[in-house]
């Protein structure tokens, strides 16, 4: 699960796909790019969420 901050509120995304879809406008979403972008964003967000959870 990824914890990110958006519009000053915390959102918990149940999956990388869900976080990807919610984090970017649908008009620029391309399924062919999903795997690469999801992996890159997922790693970044996972590290971010781990730090957030440690601070709580």
Swiss-Prot record:
Q: Which domain of life is it from?
A: Eukaryota
Protein name, UniProt field: Putative uncharacterized protein YPR074W-A
